Amino acid sequence: VSFLLNGPDGQSVPVSLPVPGLHNARNAACAAVIALLAGAEPAAVTEALSRFSGVARRFEHRGKKAGVHFVDDYAHLPTEVAATISAAKSGNWNRLVAVFQPHRYSRTEALWRSFGNAFSEADLLYVTDVYPSGEAPRPGVSGQLIVDAVKADCPGLEVRYVQRRTDLVATLGNELADGDCCLTMGAGDLTTVPDEVQMLLSDNNE
């Protein structure tokens, strides 16, 4: 993502980041302003930002296999999910296949309605069951709540509920195609899925 940072003196500083997303642009703009106010040279600021590769589990590129790009992100709240999907949508791929694992029963119960529009820019959405993170199950609280919210708010988006995480890798292996981006999101144990799917695709292509 690239943008111009306009200073109070009328000077424009071009900034280019190797990571996508409006949220990254905003963070970079804040960092650049602070650095410039502290006396840093504009060239040094733009050079430093041009080498920023992101942090672990924040739009982290996990590889490419059989023409499928794999990206993993820690996003687990509605606003984070929407920002991450918006960033991913700017990529040059055929389909954006989002995979979301709700985090904690208490959070899912409180926020499930807010997820309805968060996935609107995806082409296909998979939702797993809730990652408990030490919490006990709650009656009526599952990943199905997220599915219901998305179907209500985004009727044109195809959403599939894969209740058991153990079924997810095989499901993705059968669905993903050349030119797709598989974006996994959540604060649970979904982070290993990109590696597992790539191993499956490697085995299938041998």
Cite the ranges covered by each PLM segment.
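C-terminal helical cap/extension that packs against the catalytic core
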Residues: 116-178
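Glycine/Thr-rich phosphate-binding loops of Rossmann-like dinucleotide-binding domains
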Residues: 13, 106, 135, 192-193
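A short, gly/pro- and small-residue-rich
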Residues: 142-150, 196-206
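Short amphipathic alpha-helical segments
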Residues: 83, 110-112, 138-139, 173-174, ...
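Short glycine-rich anion-binding loops that position phosphate/pyrophosphate groups of nucleotides
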Residues: 102-105, 130-133, 187-190
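Structural beta-sheet core signal
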Residues: 98-100, 127, 161, 184
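Nucleotide phosphate-binding/pyrophosphate-handling subdomain across enzymes
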Residues: 3, 7-124
